[in-house]
Amino acid sequence: MSGKRKRVVLTIKDKLDIIKKLEDGGSSKQLAVIYGIGETTVRDIRKNKEKIITYASSSDSTSLLAKRKSMKPSMYEELDRAMLEWFNQQRAKGNPISGPICAKRAEFFFYALGMDGDFNPSAGWLTRFKQRHSIREINIRNERLNGDETAVEDFCNNFRDFIERENLQPEQIYNADETGLFWKCLPSRISVIKGKCTVPGHKSIEERVTIMCCANATGLHKLKLCVVGKAKKPRSFKSTDTLNLPVSYFSQKGAWMDLSIFRQWFDKIFVPQVREYLRSKGLQEKAVLLLDNSPTHPNENVLRSDDGQIFAKYLPPNVASLIQPSDQGVIATMKRNYRAGLLQNNLEEGNDLKSFWKKLTLLDALYEIAMAWNLVKPVTISRAWKKILPMVEEKESLDFDVEDISVATVAAILQHTKGLENVTTENLEKWLEVDSTEPGYEVLTDSEIIRRAQGQADESSENEEEEIELIPEKHINHAAALQWTENLLDYLEQQGDMILPDRLVIRKLRATIRNKQKMTKSSQ
């Protein structure tokens, strides 16, 4: 007769590890044996997967997750949700947070939520709040966090020591950061106000996406841009498979990055692509991803490969705005490339602004922003790391490439664009920076925090399935497509300077279309 199995109480970290193993194809039976638990417990963990991940993602401490064994809720759950949302936003924005500030805010939310009874945000309540959400420290110095030069020096020294201990090369050190992009915002003679575009018909919310760029410290490995739009399948995509897009596309009802999307990106895109790159360079498959404290970035314990060799590390909130590499001109250069590219396309097509504006779709924008990211030079990225890793900038200083596109270059394009000849330098600069302060994550007002804490749906949650774009439906049959490839091949043959690979690509495309045409005829 077998003895009774000893009761095992798993930590939150254990549950996260089990979830990862289940996602990678592990069986409930095997995991039950490994962790000394029943299969029912494993199934319960699978069932509560999202709740566990959300809880861990909002935690401030990996070490506390390794100790904490329950997700015991607060007796004031709505207040707890509101306070956590508020706390994460304040930390991300670099605002000072202290015990008294938290207590005052908790009292405000308690009454704003219409909760009954007396509430005393005592030191005991604050301690329990920190424990519930694995927050290491809530008291951050009472000065504005966005300019702490001493903290910058301390972090940089500690980070360099960390890199040396882990034996990491610049090729193994990455940074990712989100930003909002008003993809259909064009300059006009009317003044451009930061955060709003004045071109007739522009809808800043509808025509905004979140973009996340990620590259290593050498700038030699740039991952495809991660783009978050509102619609799962925008009309402009038509039959385009999202896997074939020049970006990694995700959807969210407000076109914001969120915890779930970031985790998917990390597990399914970042980790595999980094492994592949490091393997190609003959380097150990080990890397660190440096992040800021955005509310959409999960806990370090969640952002970790199965073998623990690829992981995330966070910039302290009081230094992120000063040294985050992507914010040191990388994102700004990409956006400038994008907008200059739009103007150049308009110029080459010979359209007036109104016609170009009407035809521009999200799909067009994705190809253009991908091109803009490709045009960001490795040296631009490596220089952005000079505050954290001076040796990287020195190593890359031999790159004597031409400078990135300037405001003067964009102004020169404007001079040849009908309807934009008189745009002032001031308006041009405002247009180029119109979304420079867009964070890429949703910043909630107090009233929005309250509605969310009460479980009320956002007004913007409707119609998330399909994005409205005025695109004329057009059906192109196989015969027409085949004729176009024939014409294009004739053109390439006439051009003496066209290289052989270009012609081979078109010939391959022609063969594919012919096969499709034959299959269609045989099925009729």
UniProtKB/Swiss-Prot annotation:
Residues 28-48, 100-132 bind DNA. GO terms for molecular function: DNA binding. GO terms for cellular component: nucleus. PANTHER family: JERKY PROTEIN HOMOLOG-LIKE, TRANSPOSON. This is Jerky protein homolog-like. Belongs to the tigger transposable element derived protein family. Residues 168-385 form the DDE-1 domain. It is found in: Nucleus. Residues 67-139 form the HTH CENPB-type domain. Transmembrane segments: none annotated. InterPro entries: CenT-Element_Derived, DDE_SF_endonuclease_dom, Homeodomain-like_sf, HTH_CenpB_DNA-bd_dom, HTH_Psq, RNaseH_sf. Disulfide bonds: none annotated. Its main location: nucleus. Abundantly expressed in the majority of tissues examined, including brain and skeletal muscle. It comes from Homo sapiens (Human). SUPFAM superfamilies: Homeodomain-like. Residues 1-52 form the HTH psq-type domain. One of its GO terms (biological process) is central nervous system development. Keywords: DNA-binding, Nucleus. It holds the Pfam family DDE_1.
